[in-house]
């Protein structure tokens, strides 16, 4: 992504950010580009069919692993977000016209790719009366209809915390309901000005009350302090979060927030152990972990921890490996 955003002038914050050059990554942040047979087949299919996934278009470092396990992530609602977070690669601007056919097309892509587990995320659509709640819910329903053996994880904005809008999504019964808090209270407003920390916790609490497996994510290296991470983990658990992923911030472009620090692998191991001790049912932590990484395995693990039966058509997810991005001691 270039420093200059498409279709608008840079904000003063972005101009200030751009004064700091892109940071050089430390030696421990490395990816493994192992192209197995499932990855090769999926890559060929996506290319020939003209399909679109976040995995490919965002250059995710874990694409080789996830595609080998037939897991992929899709972005809905357009390419322009009505909100701006200082770490996020998605551009802010006026969204395109609402596309009611998008859920069907995404579900067709999931079916054609033969996915075992799909993650669906999207942009905030504050321009719409329902903030896009129907779009998220209908995408879940369409994937379940076209691919009954595929798990669906939905990663949503906050829908302003409105119980009615959230209820639309809950009613579609995704395997996992995810809403990412991303950072700690002290720097939350600066980094995510259109969101509110307590409101995000309440969104997760509402998902838990609806009987769904819940999930969130923390990004490290944006200016937080160590004890603040511990408090955020406790806050998330108290709100009813079942699954937590913890990752390193990687700056998308010069106009985004500069990296405050590089978190060493041993700190990720420490945080993983801490999160497990707090009581999270599923934890993945590492520099290259992303919120959708090994998502199917984490869901199956959480289901078993709750004493729930994993449907027969999804039991294969429980046997997936932890993956290379998980930090190890």
UniProtKB/Swiss-Prot annotation:
Residues 67-281 form the Radical SAM core domain. It is an enzyme of class 2 (transferase). GO terms for molecular function: 4 iron, 4 sulfur cluster binding; lipoate synthase activity; metal ion binding. This is Lipoyl synthase. Its cofactor is [4Fe-4S] cluster. It comes from the Bacteria. Binds 2 [4Fe-4S] clusters per subunit. One cluster is coordinated with 3 cysteines and an exchangeable S-adenosyl-L-methionine. Keywords: 4Fe-4S, Cytoplasm, Iron, Iron-sulfur, Metal-binding, S-adenosyl-L-methionine, Transferase. It catalyses: [[Fe-S] cluster scaffold protein carrying a second [4Fe-4S](2+) cluster] + N(6)-octanoyl-L-lysyl-[protein] + 2 oxidized [2Fe-2S]-[ferredoxin] + 2 S-adenosyl-L-methionine + 4 H(+) = [[Fe-S] cluster scaffold protein] + N(6)-[(R)-dihydrolipoyl]-L-lysyl-[protein] + 4 Fe(3+) + 2 hydrogen sulfide + 2 5'-deoxyadenosine + 2 L-methionine + 2 reduced [2Fe-2S]-[ferredoxin]. It comes from Leifsonia xyli subsp. xyli (strain CTCB07). It holds the Pfam family Radical_SAM. Pathway: Protein modification; protein lipoylation via endogenous pathway; protein N(6)-(lipoyl)lysine from octanoyl-[acyl-carrier-protein]: step 2/2. [4Fe-4S] cluster 2 binds at residues 81, 85, 88. Its EC number is 2.8.1.8. GO terms for cellular component: cytoplasm. Belongs to the radical SAM superfamily. Lipoyl synthase family.
